[in-house]
Design a protein with these regions (language model features):
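Short recognition helix of helix-turn-helix/winged-helix DNA-binding domains
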Residues: 1-68
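Winged helix-turn-helix DNA-binding recognition segment
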Residues: 51-111
């Protein structure tokens, strides 16, 4: 009975965990996907690395296209677009389309 009450108590609970690029590198150390196709976690890590590279070049955003990300991740365009849309729904990424180019920005705190 206590376990059920505890589950109900946290049913609507939302939790945000702040992570760092270094943590992601640590988590992936020694991990190698046997397929060329990226997992969602690998694709998200790739976005973190792309955002970091953009910031190093003093850009706030990642410039590219869904096709470019699709090729890098070995996904089809629909899957890539749906993934970015899902990340938008989670509030993790902001997306702006300029013609056929996608401008992405991870909603991150720099410190």
């Amino acid at each position: 009975m206590k376990q059920e009450n505890r589950q109900n108590q946290y049913a609507e609970f939302s939790m945000t965990i702040s992570t760092s690029r270094e943590l992601w590198r640590y988590l992936f150390r020694g991990q190698k996907n046997s397929s060329e196709k990226f997992t969602r976690v690998e694709a998200f890590h790739d976005l973190i690395e792309r955002q970091y590279a953009a910031l190093q070049q003093e850009n706030d955003c990642i410039f590219g296209s869904i096709s470019c990300l699709s090729r890098a991740w070995h996904w089809d365009r629909d899957t890539t677009s749906a993934f970015i849309t899902d990340l938008e729904k989670f509030g993790v990424v902001s997306r702006y389309d300029i013609g056929k180019r996608a401008v992405l920005k991870l909603n991150c705190t720099i410190g």
